[in-house]
Every structure is written in structure tokens, then in C-alpha cells.
């Protein structure tokens, strides 16, 4: 099975090109859906890719949304309103919900990802629990493994409980995996979960993604 996903050439400078050329040593382990991305393993990566990822992660600019015209902004506001209604049971506080959706949109678009897919992945990974921790230590909304803070961040895994930081790591890492897999989302999701080539996790994300489907 193969899910095709378009590669964003504009993502964080040259990272997309670098990642597709990356020579990796993949350390894969057995699959367990309950642990979600907690099965993800650290991989060897080229210094240039590590540097580009680190630059993306440490960019401290606030998530200010940019729209090409008023129509795009109106479409975003409609999207946020509908997603907010769907999220009420998971995130009851309106301000928290709106800030979360604002950040999901920003980080997904920044990494060239579909915000609906990111919402589906978060549903599978953490059930929208900000402080979720897997049995092996993956943290936050997107269940980011702490080793990423050492590899491309400042080494502080506690920051993975910060909403924007967690979404930044999760979206950046998934974007890298998509590029590494030449746009094959099925394999990229498997790599994110540590179960490359197995169907259960990618299929779970795809099913959740459909539940967040949105038509403009």
C-alpha cells in the first residue's frame, strides 16, 4: 500500500532536498500501536540535515499567520470555527482550543503538511492530551521522543510539554520523514511510529484524518 504525498519544496530552505539525499541507518523495532510514536528510534543523519532541522526547531518567531488575500483569511476563520466545535469535548476551554488550532495550522503549513492530517495524527498519538507520556517516554500532543531535543534542540525534554514546541518538533520530524520517503506518506508515518512498512499505524492515522476532513 502506498499513500502519495506532495513534497513541499519551500519548507525551511533546502531541508526538503537535503532530506531526500540523506543516507540513513534506520534502527527499527517491533510495532505497538498503544505506544504510538514511542517506538520511534534515533537515526544517523547528515550534518547538513541536522543543522537544517535544528534551525527550524530553534526559530523563536511567534506563530503569526500570513494570508495572501482576505479570502484566504476568511477561509481560515471558517476552518478554525468548525474545528473548534469538533474539539469541544477534547479541549473544553475556548481560548486553549483556539490557540491550539492556530498553532496546528501555523506549524502544519510551515512544514508543508495538511492541518487535517496533523489533527488526525494527534488524535491517534495522544488523544489531544498535552501532557501525555508513553510507556517509553514520548511526550505531548505529537508524542515526540526526548532524544530529538538532544539531537536537534537544546537538550531540554521538558519543553516538549509546551504546545508550540511539541507541534514544531512533530511537524518538522514528520516532514523530514516524508522527504526521506520521496513523498510516500504511508512509509513516512510508519517511520514516525517506528513501524516502517507495517499497515496498522498509517491506517489508523488515515482513518482519524478522514474524521477531521474539511471542505472549504
Give the location of each predicted region:
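N-terminal secretory targeting signals
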Residues: 1-85, 90-94, 210-216
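Catalytic glycan-binding domains that act on GlcNAc-containing polysaccharides
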Residues: 59-216
Amino acid at each position: 500500500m502506498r499513500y502519495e504525498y506532495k513534497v513541499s519544496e519551500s519548507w525551511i530552505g533546502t531541508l526538503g532536498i537535503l532530506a531526500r539525499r540523506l543516507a540513513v541507518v534506520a534502527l527499527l523495532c517491533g510495532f505497538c500501536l498503544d505506544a504510538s510514536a514511542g517506538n520511534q528510534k534515533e537515526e544517523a543523519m547528515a550534518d547538513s540535515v541536522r543543522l537544517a532541522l535544528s534551525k527550524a526547531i530553534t526559530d523563536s518567531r511567534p506563530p503569526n499567520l500570513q494570508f495572501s488575500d482576505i479570502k484566504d483569511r476568511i477561509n481560515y476563520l471558517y476552518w478554525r470555527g468548525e474545528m473548534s466545535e469538533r474539539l469541544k469535548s477534547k479541549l473544553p476551554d475556548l481560548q486553549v482550543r483556539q490557540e491550539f488550532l492556530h498553532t496546528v495550522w501555523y506549524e502544519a503549513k510551515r512544514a508543508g503538511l495538511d492541518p487535517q492530517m496533523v489533527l488526525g495524527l494527534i488524535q491517534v498519538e495522544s488523544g489531544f492530551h498535552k501532557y501525555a507520556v508513553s510507556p517509553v517516554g514520548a511526550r505531548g500532543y505529537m508524542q515526540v521522543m526526548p532524544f530529538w531535543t538532544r539531537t536537534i534542540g537544546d537538550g531540554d525534554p521538558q519543553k516538549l510539554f509546551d504546545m508550540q514546541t511539541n507541534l514544531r518538533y512533530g511537524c518538522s520530524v514528520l516532514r523530514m520523514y516524508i522527504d526521506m520517503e520521496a513523498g510516500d506518506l504511508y512509509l513516512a508515518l510508519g517511520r514516525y511510529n517506528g513501524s516502517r512498512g507495517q499497515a496498522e499505524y498509517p491506517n489508523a492515522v488515515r482513518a482519524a484524518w478522514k474524521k477531521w476532513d474539511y471542505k472549504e
